[in-house]
UniProtKB/Swiss-Prot annotation:
Topology within the bilayer: Multi-pass membrane protein
Signal sequence, start to end: none
Record-stated family: Belongs to the UPF0114 family.
Pfam families in alphabetical order: UPF0114
Keywords, comma-separated and alphabetical: Cell membrane, Membrane, Transmembrane, Transmembrane helix
Xref: InterPro entries: UPF0114, UPF0114_bac
Transmembrane segments: 15-35, 53-73, 136-156
Protein name: UPF0114 protein PC1_0431
UniProt KW Membrane keyword: yes
Main location: membrane
Record localization: Cell membrane
One cellular component (GO) term of this entry: plasma membrane
Amino acid sequence: MERFIENLMYTSRWLLAPVYLGLSLGLLALAIKFFQEVFHVLPNIFDIAEADLVLVLLSLIDMTLVGGLLVMVMLSGYENFVSALDITDGREKLNWLGKMDSGSLKNKVAASIVAISSIHLLRVFMDARNIPDNKLMWYVIIHLTFVLSALVMGYLDRMSRYEKSKAA
């Protein structure tokens, strides 16, 4: 009975495969919105104010960072929790594949969230005169919470790696 339960639990990791595949649909939706924004701004490029263009570009950068985050979570999550990716050497292989454990993935995700939050905060500050002070304060507090969380996660990861190397 114990062996059956263990095998069932181990096999159940494959339930994550369609979830990771579903993230690729999210990536497709993000790409569609990205190009929708590009096609929306291009016809008006000579009429748009510089500040508005910067806001659009920040939005595009934001979407690009989210897309990179999706790819990172999809591929490394699949590889860490479902199965190793069997990519032939002749194809373009991302150099970080197979090297990112769940701790590294968490740190990369946290760093990406901080970068995305930074871009969003910059976009908010570009329009600060139209946003109430208390709302600006909350944007900054939330961003600093992301930064602090990323720093603490990085510190804890470093400490656990240090403890592992010390024990070895």
